A protein has these predicted regions:
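Concave beta-strand-loop units of leucine-rich repeat
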Residues: 1-4, 8, 16-28, 32, ...
Length: 381
């Protein structure tokens, strides 16, 4: 017999283990636990036909994780007015009509290891003010506005969201962006405005071709590492950083035609650019590097994704004029650039090198020794 109501459990005060109500499509009302104060294990509500989520007015503590999923008729969550403690993570998944997560406001002062917000299709904004969470994962298909205080100390994972506006939030500890929607009908921008500083940033684009463009229009500094994995097969567009000035370390791998950083002045540590990429029969080569104001790099590395075959190495780049502004570099490592015949663009940077250990050059169309480079023999005759 299908369960249609839970009023017989009104006297329940504590659950030592897990509290799990799942796949009960006949249960249309869920307000029968007014005296429940503690769940020792995991708390799970999933696959219920309820339109309102109420009835946990006394619940203060969940020892394990909290999971609310596939509650397709629920538009708001007001069921936990005194909840103060969750042992591990909170997951809200597949709540297609949920328009407001006032539940997060109740978590102020509570520490969460992880918060997962997946496929909340009706949600357009999210207030993170006061939320203390080590990792926040957001997956969906609609653009969002994230509100909060200036600094968000969390590892933020953004999966498939076509742009997020940061309102009040200027700094985030770590950000990972992946699986942006693909479009082939024309340029579409996926903007992430408001962010000015990030600890580490990882961008991963997908295998399929796309004219969609990820943009960080206000980002000026990445204090840790920038990892760009710009596609794994067919052509995608390079992520745009119009005002990014300082990066600690940067790695680029991908299938873009160009890598552009119009305002970048310094890469404190290593700048590692793999100028070609191979996946099966698909071979992609960078055709342009644009760094007109880059003056300082700790270690400059231009190499290839795979050294197994010459046909997999870049044969398009013929010079390094993109680095004409570069004045200060600790190590120059240029290898497997089969079209490269001129190092003239590194003339200023070479002037500051002091010994041959800072000059690693080989398997290019032209391979000047350290002595030749210091003597100005920077182009193949």
């Amino acid at each position: 017999m299908a369960i249609t109501e839970v009023s017989s459990l009104r006297a329940l005060k504590e659950v030592d283990g897990n509290f799990d109500f799942s796949s009960m499509s006949a249960l249309t009302a869920f307000n029968g636990f007014p005296n429940l104060t503690t769940v020792g294990g995991n708390f799970t509500l999933s696959g219920l036909a309820v339109s309102e989520l109420k009835g946990f007015d006394a619940l203060t503590s969940i020892g394990g994780s909290m999971s609310l999923s596939n509650l397709n008729e629920v538009t708001s969550i007001d069921a936990f007015p005194v909840l103060k403690s969750i042992g591990s993570q909170c997951s809200l998944i597949g709540l297609k009509k949920l328009q407001d997560i006032s539940l997060l406001a109740q978590f102020k002062g509570m520490h969460l290891n992880n918060c997962i917000l997946n496929n909340l299709d009706a949600l357009t904004s999210l207030d993170l003010t006061g939320l203390e969470v080590d990792a926040l994962q957001i997956t969906g298909k609609n653009a969002l506005t994230l509100k909060g205080s200036k600094t968000l100390n969390t590892n933020l994972t953004i999966n498939g969201i076509p742009g997020i506006s940061f309102s009040g939030i200027e700094e985030v500890q770590n950000v990972s962006v992946s699986n942006m929607p693909a479009t082939i009908t024309g340029r579409v921008e996926y903007n992430f405005p408001g962010l000015k500083k990030i600890g580490t940033l990882s961008v991963s684009q997908a295998y399929g071709a796309s004219l969609g463009v990820l943009r960080f229009p206000d980002l000026t500094e990445i204090s840790g590492k920038l990892t760009l994995s710009e596609g794994f097969g067919q052509k995608v567009q390079p992520t745009e950083f119009p005002v990014l000035r300082i990066v600690n370390n940067m790695t680029y791998t991908g299938v873009c035609d160009a890598l552009r950083f119009p305002a970048l002045e310094e890469v404190t540590g290593e700048l590692n650019i793999k100028t070609s990429y191979v996946n099966g029969s698909l071979v992609s080569m960078l055709q342009e590097i644009y760094t007109p104001v880059l003056k300082k790099v700790g270690i400059l590395v231009l190499t290839t994704y795979s050294k197994n075959q010459d046909s997999w190495c870049n044969n398009v780049l013929t010079n390094l004029d993109c680095f004409r502004a570069l004045e200060n570099v600790g190590v120059i490592n240029i290898e497997y650039q089969l079209g490269l015949v001129s190092f003239k663009g590194l003339e200023k940077a070479i002037g500051g090198l002091t010994d041959d250990t800072s000059w690693v050059v080989g398997h290019n169309a032209y391979n000047p020794t350290f002595e030749q480079a210091k003597n100005g023999e920077l182009e193949r005759n």
